[in-house]
Amino acid sequence: PTYEMTYKKKEVIRPSHLGLELAKDKHASNGTNEQDLMDGFTVKDTQTATFDETWRPVWGETATIRNHYNELAVTLNQASMQRDIRIRFRVYDDGMGLRYEFPQQQKLNYIVVKEEHTQFAMTGDHTAYWIPGDYDTQEYETVISKMSEIRSKMKAAITSNASQTQFSPTGVQTSLQLKTDNGLYINLHEAACVNFPTMHLNLDDKNMVFESWLTPDATGMKGYVQTPFNTPWRTVIVSDDARDMLASNLILNLNEPCKIEDTSWIHPTKYCGVWWEMIAGGKQWSYTFDLPSVNLENLDYSKCRPHGQHPANTENVKRYIDFAAKNGLQEVLVEGWNIGWEDWFGHYKDYVFDFQTPYPDFDIKYLNDYAHSKGVKLMMHHETSGSTQNYERHLEAAYSLMNKYGYDAVKSGYVGDIIPRGDYHYSQSTNNHYLYCIKEAAKHHIMVNAHEATRPTGLCRTWPNLVGNESARGTEYEAFGGSEPYHTVILPFTRLQGGPMDYTPGIFVTKLSEWCDNKSYVHTTLCGQLALYLTMYSPLQMAAD
């Protein structure tokens, strides 16, 4: 099957192929007799529909959002395998989405996806605003170049990160923003990525064709699917006015309505916290230098000598609480409150944290009581060190602890390579982990701000307790040499298409030497930092320093 797309009589997508390559795998219903879902189809049925609604987001930039589209659902029969698939298109004034649908059938019950081959054939050598394709990180600076220059600029675009896995010299990530010579703005992304890997794009730079490239898991396969099943939407937003790209709600509209019945506990939040003084290099997340390694099952921190550089302590956190109360901030984040930070990173270690036990100098009950007496709440911090399986083992107890002391929001982190070992940050299984945490948090009336997780695809409509994601190069990099001045004015067109970003602005002390021995300067002005609160929309905003 193929499709093409025009906008105001201008060609946007040239005829482009659709389909999925399936593995001849013993876990599939058809085993080694499996055939690809690429060709050999005949049209069995077509159905059209029009839909128009106005819905109210729990939070957002507007009080209401209109969801108005025309729909075409094409059922295709693959006679050689005696099975049907459906490709559904939804067309909006500002773009379209398409997805593959697999009704349950005898010959289409369990399938193993080897690769998806959804193409986006461009009409020319457009200007692209891109970051390197990577299975583990989105924390790259945006490169502005012609599509034909991606290959030559890729090596320089790849900068060091705690966990990174590139896959192609012309592979890029979505949301990908493009600008044509004839005045069109085009954005390629995905919506409603549920139980499926994150999609990247690989460029055939001879023919100017982008093709989907899914994130594998540790087995090398891309997805294990039980029908009935729908893939995420593959989206194209288009306009001849750049401002329309920022106003588009296409990604949100392609997601399911809110699944949380009572949303009264979900609220916008301004916060400060114990974070920047560690990022800038002056203080430590850890409590002691006595330990060459940590075994949480057999360790008494009360016998360790504190190194005196641990800001997540009772007296210092009280200062932040007082500041928040005085300045109208609702919450105070405290990183480094819990035991285990002495060897938390870089060892592929499974049991790094228990997410429940504070260091000796952090009085969790007293500080929460003190904060509540001031009309402020503490914000929880759960760094996983990439061990999703350890986090899931402790998740119920960790969320219950939050309920016990009155926390209503958590900042989670996934720094480092993913455990189970060999998996990636954006695989099907890891994406399922992120959503599992969000769903479990909703049961406990907890809002989630996930850092180092997969880039958002509009799931905050369905699960509005997902109030923030990082999923891009944020303010912390200003302590590591900084970002290009244009970085923050491109992100709204790229990263923010799928949902808000916890960019953590609010750096007013721009000479880092005032914090520590760091000789870097924050590449900003006071006015620029204040402007970020408007241009980088999020219901969750930090006053970082």
What is each model feature region?
Residues 1-261:
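N-terminal accessory beta-strand-rich subdomains and adjacent acidic, glycine-rich linkers
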Residues 78-80, 91-93, 124, 239, ...:
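Short, flexible loop/turn elements at secondary-structure junctions
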Residues 117, 164, 173-175, 321, ...:
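Short amphipathic alpha-helical segments and helix-helix/interface helices
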Residues 226-327, 331:
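An acidic-aromatic substrate-binding cleft motif
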Residues 330, 408, 541:
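Short acidic/polar active-site loop segments enriched in Thr and Asp
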Residues 335-521, 525:
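Aromatic- and carboxylate-enriched substrate-binding clefts and catalytic-loop regions
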Residues 511-545:
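Glycine-rich, aromatic-lined ligand/substrate-binding cores of catalytic
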